[in-house]
UniProtKB/Swiss-Prot annotation:
PANTHER family: S-RIBOSYLHOMOCYSTEINE LYASE (PTHR35799:SF1). One of its GO terms (molecular function) is iron ion binding. Involved in the synthesis of autoinducer 2 (AI-2) which is secreted by bacteria and is used to communicate both the cell density and the metabolic potential of the environment. The regulation of gene expression in response to changes in cell density is called quorum sensing. Catalyzes the transformation of S-ribosylhomocysteine (RHC) to homocysteine (HC) and 4,5-dihydroxy-2,3-pentadione (DPD). Binds 1 Fe cation per subunit. The lineage of its organism: Bacteria, Bacillati, Actinomycetota, Actinomycetes, Bifidobacteriales. NCBIfam families: PRK02260.2-3, PRK02260.3-1. The keyword Iron applies. This is S-ribosylhomocysteine lyase. InterPro entries: LuxS_sf, Metalloenz_LuxS/M16, S-ribosylhomocysteinase.
Length: 164
């Protein structure tokens, strides 16, 4: 293997002290400005306490598909919301920047819908044609986790509980 001389890129989420955060929360991570001045913001939507809990893949997958629609309806400039590999939450990308309180309220409303109103018909893209792992969904698990997250309250700050 050739000797590496270039510095390795810094991955922000690997710099976060996961022992200090208090989930569930919304955390503003960073903003990037593109070559044409377009601004994209990245948020950490942490649903469970790192290294203490992880949402099973079927439930997380169903939450992912459902909030793809629900957050898009609630957050102007929504681009994407993708799950963390550790299964404790999601990265949310938006055009422009939104206060964490606004994002936390949108997340709360979305989880309330999942927990108390959603039916299988509300979960989009659950067929072999529309999903890369369509058999790995669980609305029951998504509902149970959404209820638990809502009971704990979603904070607009990762280190100090400021529940919205």
């Amino acid at each position: 293997m050739a000797e590496e001389t270039a510095e390795k890129p810094v991955v922000e989420s690997f710099q976060l002290d996961h022992t200090k955060v208090k989930a569930p929360y919304v955390r503003y991570i960073d903003t990037e400005t593109g070559p044409h001045g377009d601004v994209i913001s990245n948020y950490d939507l942490r649903l469970t306490q790192p290294n203490k809990q992880a949402i099973p893949t079927g439930g997380l997958h169903t939450i992912e598909h459902t909030i793809a629609v629900l957050l898009r309806e609630r957050i102007p400039g929504y681009i994407d919301c993708s799950p963390f590999g550790c299964r404790t939450g999601f990265h949310l990308l938006t055009w422009g920047t939104h206060p964490t309180e606004e994002v936390a309220k949108a997340l709360k409303e979305s989880l309330e819908f999942i927990a108390y109103k959603a039916t299988w018909d509300d979960v989009p893209a659950t067929t072999e044609k529309s999903c890369g792992n369509y058999r790995d969904h669980s609305l029951f698990t998504a509902k149970e986790w959404a209820k638990q997250i809502l009971e704990e309250g979603i904070s607009s700050d990762p280190f100090e509980r400021k529940v919205v």
